[in-house]
């Protein structure tokens, strides 16, 4: 009973103190927002003022001081914003931004930025003629390479190390030495059992299928008909007609007959040399045994 009496007296004495500090819900609504603002920082300013003795400026004053700008800086920012707004409202810029003219430059800028930052190492920047299309071969792993094309690619293009780029369709097996060999092949012309990597190209709705071959791998290297004679001309080096002409060098009949009719001692020798068809070069001494000497 005595405990309840003391509790009631304490509640009556504490009521005026609570109303003085925080105010009643009806009359102190404004002050409640001021001292206990809503949001994630509720009550933070009150604690800061209590800890610093009221010397810390309020959050509104800090924000106002931070937003003070220099006149020249404010003027420059205004000009930039005006230019940006005018550029966005320009129909020519909108058309250019949505067209294919700027897509290639954006892709090249992105690649150049990655290369400068060391994110991409160019393996062979000119493995294909730049007049045909532009692309980069970059390593994406230990045994993987990735081809980034910045322009639509022709149907079939190949570049062999030490040989110029050429259109391809068939050719003998070849061992790749040096840089990898890249094939640009349309989906309708895939004819080899190799892994095909589909590379999306900007400015083109048709994907490009790329074959990447590692150095030292034996592959079927297609060659175009216009380039095939350059690589497969056994006639120019082997020419059996020019080098294997036993008729011109081994004609023992003509020399042997003249030698046998003119001198009896030279006839048997010329016939003996002429009998060996496998050694036609030894028939040449026959003219020296002619009657003219």
UniProtKB/Swiss-Prot annotation:
Superkingdom of source: Eukaryota
Record-level Gene Ontology MF annotations: structural constituent of egg chorion
Chief location of this protein within or outside the cell: secreted
Organism phylogeny: Eukaryota, Metazoa, Ecdysozoa, Arthropoda, Hexapoda
Annotated protein name in UniProt: Chorion protein S36
Subcellular location field: Secreted
Family that this chain belongs to: Belongs to the chorion protein S36 family.
Function: Chorion membrane (egg shell) protein; protects the egg from the environment.
Stretches with biased composition (Polar residues): 235-253
A GO BP annotation: chorion-containing eggshell formation
Listed GO CC annotations: egg chorion; extracellular region
Entry keyword set: Secreted, Signal
Region (Disordered): 235-293
Signal peptide positions (record): 1-20
